[in-house]
Amino acid sequence: MAPSEDIPSSEQRHQKIQARILSLKKQISFSKWWTALFFLISLGAAVNFRFLPPISENVRQFLGISPSSTLISIALIVYAFSALILILGRMNTASVHFHGWSHIGYLSAFYLFYYYSGTLRDNFWAVFIAGLTILSLENYRVWSVCSETIKKEEKTLAFLDK
């Protein structure tokens, strides 16, 4: 193999960097879309999921008695603090990937638990504020890391263009 085959050309490096920049911009965009999905789910929860059929007695018997609102709230608090600690820990790793999809699943489950227990109207704001806090911090983390990396990549492009 000739030495020139091991070293990518200037144009290849340029294209690779541009592809990385595009990928980072997509990560920022994905994080916004996931947050929009949470808002849509929250809209459904705000109207007590009126568009869903009522839970039948057979399903209620199969699922059993719902946990009390207090237990669900304790679980929400534990989850929210755990999620925030994990996000803050990821801030140090400089990972550019958005991890909010799992948060949306958990937060949706809390809406459903409150819905099943019949206390969604009383606890909607607790889930919404927890979700808004968690997803906002995750969005900030992704935006911060991606923006910093994009600036570095753009500096590299400027250096290659000289």
Regions of interest found by a model, annotated:
Residues 2-7, 80-85, 144-147:
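Membrane-water interface of transmembrane alpha-helices
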Residues 1-31, 156-162:
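N-terminal juxtamembrane cytosolic/stromal segments of multi-pass membrane proteins
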Residues 31, 69-78, 126-133:
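Alpha-helical transmembrane segments of polytopic membrane proteins
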Residues 49-59, 85-91, 112-122:
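Juxtamembrane "helix-exit" motif on the non-cytosolic side of transmembrane helices
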Residues 118-162:
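Terminal transmembrane helical module of multi-pass membrane proteins
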Residues 35-73:
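Hydrophobic transmembrane helix segments
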Residues 38-44, 77-84, 132-139:
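Hydrophobic alpha-helical transmembrane segments of multipass integral membrane proteins
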Residues 76-112:
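Loop-to-transmembrane helix junctions at the membrane interface
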